[in-house]
């Protein structure tokens, strides 16, 4: 994860073909051979770690409530697949342990995005979620394959302050396009190893703001993007210095990167 090659990451697994953040989506991404899987971590009311993007359950399960107000048993009983297709009816919300069991014996990199935010749930809850994730990562010996990601600079500063350089820190946006949920008293150029770049102006694209890529280069931050998988855009992002594409269509992203000579066949 040192930026020596351009990485292809599956955003919430193979979400183009399977319901996002479910074991079928992760299994497909692993089979396909992406470099990394990005996934989203929440903690339940009884302290278990689950993988689901939204804190609110409605979008992917059709049920009211939030991850932090439900027990693991309650969340595991929900259907996280039917919203995508009837074919995936009764697909459960996976746990972090279940996901690690899948990828542990591979060389898959993992981008763990911590989604419990201090401004919503308080420092204690958000930081405990981070600690439990890192304890689990260490228990399974996958530290060297894991990066810690969050929209909350407060969470990232906590992880960095407690664990130092044990994990690459992945931020979301820089000062000119700040989209973090909570700010922290640590300069982003000191905190971030990686940063997903966003447009400074709504409706435009990250590539419209080359100064953000230049900022990353100046401060030794590896830039990445999560954008539509189009050849012309990929060419421009590569020229600007992008080192990772977090893709919603891994098949198309892989095709483009191979055509550009940036992935082996």
Where are these regions (language model features)?
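Phosphate-group recognition and catalysis centered on beta-loop-alpha active-site segments
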Residues: 1-265
């Amino acid at each position: 994860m040192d930026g020596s090659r351009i990485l292809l990451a599956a955003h919430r697994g193979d979400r183009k073909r399977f319901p996002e953040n479910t074991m079928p989506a992760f299994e497909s991404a692993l089979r396909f051979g992406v470099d990394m899987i990005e996934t989203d971590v929440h903690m339940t009311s009884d302290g278990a770690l689950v993988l689901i993007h939204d804190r609110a359950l409605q979008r992917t399960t059709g049920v009211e409530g939030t991850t932090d107000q439900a027990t693991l048993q309650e969340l595991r009983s929900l259907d996280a697949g039917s919203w995508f297709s009837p074919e995936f009816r009764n697909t459960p919300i996976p746990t972090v342990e279940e996901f690690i069991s899948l990828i542990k014996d591979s060389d898959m990199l993992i981008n763990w995005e911590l989604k419990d935010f201090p401004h919503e749930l308080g420092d204690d809850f958000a930081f405990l979620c981070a600690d439990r994730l890192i304890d689990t990562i260490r228990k399974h010996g996958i530290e060297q394959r894991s990066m810690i990601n969050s929209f909350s600079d407060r969470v990232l500063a906590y992880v960095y302050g407690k664990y130092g350089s044990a994990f690459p820190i992945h931020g979301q946006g820089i000062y000119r396009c700040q989209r973090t949920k909570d700010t922290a008293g640590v300069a982003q150029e000191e905190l971030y190893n990686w940063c997903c770049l966003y447009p400074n102006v709504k409706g435009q694209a990250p590539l419209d703001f080359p100064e953000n890529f230049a900022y990353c280069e100046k401060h030794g931050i590896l830039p990445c993007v999560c954008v539509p998988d189009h050849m012309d855009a990929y060419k421009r992002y590569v020229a600007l210095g992008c080192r990772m594409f977090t893709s919603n269509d891994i098949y198309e992203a892989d095709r483009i990167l191979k055509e550009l000579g940036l992935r082996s066949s």
